Amino acid sequence: MAEILALGISHYPPLHGHDDRMAWILKRMLQNPKLPDTLRTPAGWPEPMRAEWGNDEGAASAARHRADLVGWLDRTRAALDAFKPDFVLIWGDDQYENFREDVVPPYCIAAYDRIQFTSPSTNIWGKDEGFDLPGHRTAAKRLASELIEEGFDAAYAYKPLHNPLGHAFANAVMYLDYHRKGFDYPVVPFAINCYGRRVLAQRGGLPVFDRTISDAELDPPAPTPRRLFDLGAATARILARSPWRVALLASSGWSHAFLTAKNHFLWPDTPADRRMYEALRDCDWQTWRSYSGAAVEDSGQQEILNWACLAGAMSELKRKPKEMGFVDTWIFNSSKVFLIAPPQ
C-alpha cells in the first residue's frame, strides 16, 4: 500500500569541504570590481555579518554551521530509515550539468537503472569514493506516463547526457550518509530547471565579473512556482495510488547570495526566505502557489523552486510539517531549510 514521506534538506556544496574553505563563495564575490568600496572589508558590513566572519574569516562559525546542518541531516536520515521507502524521489536543480545547450527541459525524470557518481576531491571524509546506487526505472516510467496523462509533458531520460549525476542529487545522497553507514535506497532524480534565465547564460553558477550579461543573452525563464506547485501535487497524487512507499525529498538551499544582486552578491535575502518558511510552516499554500518568478529572481531564490514541488505535494496530501528548521547565515551563501513530514 502506498505511503509517502515528505522531506526537505540542503545540498550546500561547501559542506563536503573543510571549515576553513566554507566561506569561499563570499571571498570570490569580494573580488567583484563593481563592489562598493564600503563593502570591500568587514568594517562596512552589517554587524551580524561581521560577527559571523570574526577574526578567523568565518572558520569558527563554519564549525557551528556544519554542526547545525549535520544535526538536521541526521534527523532526516533517521526519519528516512524509520519509514523504509521503496525509493526516494529527489527534486533538485540542474546547474549546467545535464541541462546544457543541446537541451534544456523545464523538468526531467531520470529513469535510470543504476546511478553512479564519485565524491569531490579534498572532501571532509578524506578519501575519494565511488557510489553505485539502484534507480527505479519502473516507478520513474509510470510517474512520467501518468504526469503526461494529467497534462504535464514530463521529459525523461534513461541515461545522463553529460554529467553522471547533478550535485543536487549526489550531495543529497552523500549528506544523508554523512557518517558513511551506507545508503542503499533506490533513487529517482527529478531535475528542475530552477536557474531558468541563467542556466546557460551564467552556466547555473556564480556571476561573471569580466563582462555584463545583457538581457538579450539571458535564457527563457524557469517554470513558475505555480506550475511546479501543481507538478508536485500531481506527483503526490500519482504516487499515492501506486503500490510503493515513497520518500519525496526537496534538495536545495533557498536564497543564494551569489544570485542576489540587490545585496551585491554578498549575503542572501533572509527576510524573503523567512516569509516563505513561515508560509510552509503554516501550510499557507496560496502564498507558495501564487509566488511570482520575478520575486524568486529578485531574492536569489531560484532553488526554492524545488521546494515549490514539495509544497504542492504536501498540499495534495493535506500534510503538515512535523519538524522544521531554518539555518540562517550572512557569510555562507544561502539559507538552509529542513523539513520532515511523515504520514499521519
Features from the language model and the residues they span:
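Active-site microenvironments of hydrolase-like enzyme catalytic domains
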Residues: 88, 92-111, 255-256
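Flexible, D/E/H-enriched segments
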Residues: 1-83, 105-230, 241, 260-344
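Extracytoplasmic, non-cytosolic globular domains
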Residues: 227-235, 247, 254-258
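Nuclease catalytic cores that cleave nucleic-acid phosphodiester bonds
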Residues: 224, 237-248
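Beta-strand elements within well-structured catalytic alpha/beta cores of enzymes
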Residues: 86-93, 190, 244-254
